[in-house]
Amino acid sequence: MLHLFLTSLLAFLHPFFVSVTEVNHNDKTKSLEISTKIFFNDLEAALEKHYQKQLDILKPAQREQLDPLINEYLQKHLQLSVNDKPVKLKYLGYEIEQDAAWCYLEVPQVGRVKQIEIRNDVLFAEHDSQTNMVHITVKGNRKSTKLDNPESQASFSF
C-alpha cells in the first residue's frame, strides 16, 4: 500500500509530457488526415507564452480567437513532406476530450505515398522532457516512432 502511494506521489511530482500525432492517407479522397492530441493545459500555456495573451482553451467563446493561434503554432511546429516535397497543412479545428485537445488538419490532393518525412517539435520549447509519438498509416500499413526532445524529425517509407 505504501509502495503504491509513493509511486503515485512520484508520478505526480514528475509529470510526463507527451503528444500523439496520427497521419492517415485516405486513398479514396487522396488526402492526408492528421490529428494531434496534446494536453490542453500544455497547449494553452505554450500559446499564452508565445502570443503573450491570456487564453482559456475550454471556453467556446474564445474559439474564434484560439483557432488562428493554434493554426499558426501547428504550422510552425508540425511539418510534413510527401515524396520529398513539403506540403501545406490545412487547419480544420480542435475539440476538447477530457484533458486533451485534439487538433485536426489535412493535406488535400495527395496521390501515391512512397515516403513521408515529419518534423514535430510541438511543446519542445516548453518541456525538455517532451515526447511526441507519431503514427503514420498508408494503405493499411501503420508505422510509428517516438520523438524525444530535441529529436524532432523522422522519415517513413512505404
For each of these PLM feature ranges, what is it?
Residues 14-158:
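N-terminal soluble domains immediately following signal/targeting peptides that reside
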Residues 3-11:
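Sec-dependent N-terminal signal peptides
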